[in-house]
Amino acid sequence: MLAPALNLPKWLEENSHLLQPPINNYCVYHPSAPATQGYTVMVVGGPNVRTDYHINPTPEFFYQHRGSMLLRTVDQSTSPPTFQDIPIHEGSLFLLPANTPHCPVRFADTVGVVLEVPRPENATDCMRWYCKGCGEIVWEKKFHCTDLGTQVKEVVEEFAADDEKRKCKACGSVRSVRYEDGEVVQPPRAPE
């Protein structure tokens, strides 16, 4: 028997406490569940002001349910790579291509839904931090992703705990784990 449709506003009323830092997400559909094989669907809340960029070997689908978010991306097809901020407004959809470094910045009282497909068995995800000063890669860690919520948290905590990992080899500045207040500005709720 198929499960009933998920009423997102009702789910949020009853479960918003599950959207806790540092990752702020909750998996409502998991690929290991018989009824939802092939998809991971996460409800993601704000604020999330981590500075890490995730590189997923598969595409990611974003739907912004409440408020607006900023998806910071890196276009690696240019030399040097181009940093591009993509606002995703309330009610908007966005499909992020596979292997695109991205840093989803979510603000207070915002909620989105992210859909992912399972990674191929030999695929690796990557968590990466770029230097705020010179744009070089400060540190990265690759891993085979089997549990996004726990594995991302572990890598973020590993980076946060080690000042040497946070130090840029090119210019010597130290990368913070979180954006400072005012460093990233929330886009308007709707496109202008």
Swiss-Prot record:
Catalysed conversion reaction: 3-hydroxyanthranilate + O2 = (2Z,4Z)-2-amino-3-carboxymuconate 6-semialdehyde
Cofactors: Fe(2+)
Binding, substrate: 60, 106, 116
Keyword set, alphabetical order: Cytoplasm, Dioxygenase, Iron, Metal-binding, Oxidoreductase, Pyridine nucleotide biosynthesis
Compartments (UniProt record): Cytoplasm
GO BP term, example: anthranilate metabolic process
GO cellular component terms, A-Z: cytoplasm
One GO MF term attached to the UniProt entry: 3-hydroxyanthranilate 3,4-dioxygenase activity
Primary location group: cytoplasm
Residues that bind O2: 50
Superkingdom field: Eukaryota
Task of the protein: Catalyzes the oxidative ring opening of 3-hydroxyanthranilate to 2-amino-3-carboxymuconate semialdehyde, which spontaneously cyclizes to quinolinate.
Family: Belongs to the 3-HAO family.
Protein name as catalogued: 3-hydroxyanthranilate 3,4-dioxygenase
Organism: Coccidioides immitis (strain RS)
Lineage, broadest ranks: Eukaryota, Fungi, Dikarya, Ascomycota, Pezizomycotina
